[in-house]
A protein has these predicted regions:
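ABC-family P-loop ATPase nucleotide-binding domain
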Residues: 1-18, 228-234
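ABC family nucleotide-binding domain
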Residues: 7-222
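Generic detector of short, aliphatic-rich beta-strand segments that form the cores of beta-sheets
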Residues: 224-226
Length: 234
């Protein structure tokens, strides 16, 4: 997918996500308009229930909007079938979750190799890429460790390596420090800062002001709408 500096990687136009629960109708997203350009570093903040995770799920092609338009590097996502969406998730977007979402019985190396199974790569090439990704996050000496042998910060580093191993255009992080203590949180944020500095587009959901302060742009949601969208100094 090609891009130019003036072209938005992500374009959201009048985006809605509506849930019907019996007689009740919930607008999780209520007419959202957002553009995000390549190499931006964006925090999405807001109270619980404001629509943050719903927005991330739609951007990450884990959910579909009820109406409105979502374009990913100029391509209408709403027109894609499930196979095309799966390909986007595997190749274009890397995910980091609060709960790590690692395979409990697999080593760090095998966890990071997992997204590459769907690529036309030899096992040796998959292994080499996974080793490189783990070394990038400072875990080159823990390749054979399982999640239960790692600290919370180390598990999140494995999750970040897994997100980056396929060289995606966009990194989505949903409360990446939510389960970590303050010191480990800052270590993880230093790593995410480095990922952004190396050219990655990073979009992060957080409710913590000190974590949002790492980003260059802050979008606050309230009741499914954009309350404000502000730039901030590095």
């Amino acid at each position: 997918m090609a891009d130019t500096p003036s072209h938005a990687v992500i374009e959201l136009r009048d985006l809605y996500r509506i849930y019907e629960m019996g007689d009740q109708v919930l607008h999780a997203l209520d007419g959202v308009d957002i553009d995000i350009h390549r190499n931006e570093y964006v925090a999405v903040i807001g109270a619980s229930g404001s629509g943050k995770s719903t927005l991330m799920n739609i951007i990450g092609c884990l959910d579909r909007a009820s109406r409105g338009e979502y374009r990913l590097e100029g391509t209408p996502v709403g027109d894609m079938n499930e196979t095309e969406l799966a390909r986007i998730r595997n190749r274009e977007i890397g995910f980091v979750f609060q709960s790590f979402n690692l395979l409990g019985r697999a080593s760090a190396l095998k966890n990071v190799m997992q997204p590459l199974v769907y690529r036309k790569l030899s096992r040796s090439e998959r292994r080499a890429r996974a080793v490189e990704a783990l070394e990038r996050v400072g875990l080159g000496d823990r390749l054979d460790s399982r999640p239960n042998q790692l600290s919370g910060g180390q598990r999140q580093r494995v999750a970040i390596a897994r997100a980056l191993v396929g060289k995606p255009a966009i990194l989505l992080a949903d409360e990446p420090t939510g389960n970590l203590d303050s010191q480990t949180s800052q270590e993880i944020m230093a790593l995410i800062d480095q990922v952004h500095d190396e050219g990655q587009t990073v979009i992060m959901v957080t409710h913590e002001p000190d974590i949002a302060a790492h980003c260059r742009r802050v979008i606050r949601l309230d009741d499914g709408r954009v309350e404000y969208d502000r730039r901030q100094a590095a």
